[in-house]
A protein has these predicted regions:
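Interfacial segments of alpha-helical transmembrane regions
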Residues: 59-89, 149
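Membrane helix-loop-helix hairpins that form the core translocation module of multi-pass transporters
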Residues: 76-102, 176, 181
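Membrane-helix interfacial "entry" motifs
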Residues: 31-42, 62, 66-70, 74, ...
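Membrane-interfacial segments
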Residues: 64-68, 92, 96-101, 144, ...
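Hydrophobic core of alpha-helical transmembrane segments in multi-pass integral membrane proteins
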Residues: 53-61, 79-83, 223-238
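N-terminal transmembrane-helix/juxtamembrane module of multi-pass inner/ER membrane proteins
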Residues: 1-55, 88-118, 241
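Membrane-embedded catalytic cores of phosphoryl/pyrophosphoryl-handling enzymes
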Residues: 113-242
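Hydrophobic alpha-helical transmembrane segments
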Residues: 44-60, 76, 129-132, 152
Length: 242
């Protein structure tokens, strides 16, 4: 038996084991008997919930870039993150790999706790929610270089990932691959953006205690953080009342 044949045989045994672990891990975190958590997950997984956060990020970009062309390039870079992270996944990867979502999985589909009848599309590898949100988060981490904002953006992305697991529309493996792809996309897009805009200086005199290393006012970085916290609190209150 050749070394290649040995590797192939081992990989054939490893894949079912990983799939089994993925299913067990999903069932451990999917759903609950709490209508409150059901509402929280359902609200937080919806894109419209995060519109105020997107607007606040745009305000930060607008307030800290005097060059209109650079502002537009930042918006274009953010759009490229979504295009490469999510659209490529939805149009190419999911139909090619054709891995069932947990809610449609023939093996555990009947055991998945479905919230409000939400099952998602047939295929779930990999998670576009994880890839999209993490690519945007990583791009802004590189762009702004604020520890507070970076932490908030990562929490935002992981919150979205939690909702996908809770709702049972992705396996943990789908999420991990989505996060990995999102990180690579966000990093690639930022350095491409940096290469194209490194000669576009704002001309402002920066004071280190007031600005990040890339020239963003630290007080402006608080805006998305406050909006994120407010959104989470509002969602919790809304889920208690309704």
């Amino acid at each position: 038996m050749t070394a290649l044949q040995t590797i192939l045989m081992e990989s054939q045994g490893l894949l079912p084991m990983l799939e089994s672990f993925d299913r067990e891990a999903l069932l451990a975190v999917n759903g609950s008997d709490s209508l409150f958590l059901d509402r929280v997950a359902h609200v937080l997984t919806t894109a419209i919930t995060w519109i105020p956060l997107y607007i606040s990020l745009f305000i930060v970009v607008l307030r800290n870039n005097d060059n209109f062309r650079k502002v537009m390039m930042i918006l274009g870079a953010a759009a490229m993150c979504v295009l490469l992270a999510g659209t490529v996944d939805d149009l190419i990867v999911k139909p090619t790999v054709a891995r069932w979502r947990p809610t449609h999985d023939p093996v555990i589909g009947a055991m998945v706790d479905v919230v409000d009848g939400y099952r998602g599309g047939r295929y779930g590898f990999f998670s576009a929610h994880a890839a999209n949100t993490f690519s945007i988060a990583i791009f802004f981490c590189w762009l702004v270089r604020s520890r507070l904002l970076s932490t908030a953006m990562v929490i935002w992305s992981l919150t979205n990932c939690w909702t996908r697991l809770y709702l049972g529309v992705h396996f943990p493996g789908d999420i991990l691959v989505g996060l990995t792809w999102g990180f690579l996309v966000g990093t690639f897009v930022y350095f491409l953006f940096y290469r194209l805009t490194r000669n576009m200086t704002s001309g402002r005199r920066l004071i280190s205690s007031q600005y990040t290393s890339t020239g963003y006012q630290r007080k402006d970085c608080d805006i998305p953080v406050v909006i994120l916290v407010f959104t989470l609190i509002f969602t919790l209150i809304k889920s208690c009342i309704l």
